[in-house]
């Protein structure tokens, strides 16, 4: 795993953060060292997907990047009841060409081992290079968006949640993980400070933290948990709860009635 040092040197002109080839090369290390609970969120997203998958449906990984969630869901389903995932497909969608290409390589490398180790054939993963707002969604039992909505234009988020809700079958779920902010300024500052302490503990310097924060400004725009929950309920979900939180990173599950 290549170490993330993209912001280790002083940069005179810091561009907005992009998911390009440079980011792809260090992305696994970046996530591990800069997203509290990332590995747990991916693993438990797969557990949740395994619970709610319905036969002959689609599972979606929206903003799939290197396919961690899609692969985890596939592996969880391969270990479960074959009848539950019969006729299912996992669709991984990302608009970054470099991410899709790297994801395709990772899936092909991992596929043989998965096929040999499990008791029944794995659910196929289908990759799509596309914008989330433009790609059709249908016949879904599970939709996962792990740290993706925060990069969508705020004015387009409600419509996207409605599209997802409409694509889900009754009893289907959305797993939504996001960096969040808090309405109380003192609480918000506490979580930001602790998040930066977490990054320092994982080897990032103050320069790296500062420069990446500048690069993400106006690119990653977080919402509050209350805003997320209100939007999901308005979109047509019947139930919504936070199932994971560490500092200013959280994951919710929304269930369609």
Q: What is the predicted role of each segment?
A:
Residues 12-17, 21-41:
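Class I SAM-dependent methyltransferase Rossmann-like catalytic core
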Residues 37-55:
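Conserved alpha-helix/loop element of class I SAM-dependent methyltransferases that forms part
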Residues 60, 65-116, 120-134:
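Class I SAM-dependent methyltransferase SAM/SAH-binding core
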Residues 144:
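A conserved beta-strand element that flanks and buttresses the S-adenosyl-L-methionine
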Residues 158-170:
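A short glycine-rich, Lys/Arg-flanked "PGG" loop and its adjoining helix->strand segment in the class I
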Residues 175-201:
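Conserved class I S-adenosyl-L-methionine
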Residues 218-235:
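Short alpha-helix
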Residues 235-257:
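Core SAM-dependent methyltransferase catalytic element
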């Amino acid at each position: 795993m290549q170490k993330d040092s993209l912001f280790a040197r002083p940069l005179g002109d810091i561009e907005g953060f992009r998911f390009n080839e440079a980011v792809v090369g260090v992305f696994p290390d970046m996530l591990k060292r800069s997203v509290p609970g990332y590995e747990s969120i991916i693993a438990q997203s797969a557990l949740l997907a395994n619970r709610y998958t319905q036969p002959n449906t689609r599972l979606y990984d929206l903003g799939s990047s290197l396919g961690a969630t899609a692969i985890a869901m596939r592996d969880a389903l391969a270990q479960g009841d074959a009848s539950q995932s019969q006729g299912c497909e996992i669709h991984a969608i990302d608009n970054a060409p470099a991410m899709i290409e790297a994801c395709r390589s990772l899936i092909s490398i991992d596929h043989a081992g998965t096929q040999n180790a499990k008791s029944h054939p794995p659910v196929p993963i289908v990759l799509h290079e596309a914008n989330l707002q433009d790609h059709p969604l249908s016949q879904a039992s599970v939709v996962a968006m792990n740290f993706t909505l925060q990069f969508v234009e705020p004015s387009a988020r409600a419509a996207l949640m409605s599209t997802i809700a409409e694509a889900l079958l009754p009893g289907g779920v959305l797993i939504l993980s996001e960096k969040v902010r808090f309405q109380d300024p003192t609480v918000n500052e506490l979580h930001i400070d602790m998040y930066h302490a977490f990054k320092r503990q994982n080897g990032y310097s103050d320069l790296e933290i500062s420069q990446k924060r500048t690069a993400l400004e106006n690119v990653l725009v977080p919402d509050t948990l209350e805003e997320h929950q209100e939007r999901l309920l308005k979109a047509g979900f019947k139930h919504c709860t936070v199932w994971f939180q560490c500092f200013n990173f959280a994951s919710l599950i929304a269930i369609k009635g």
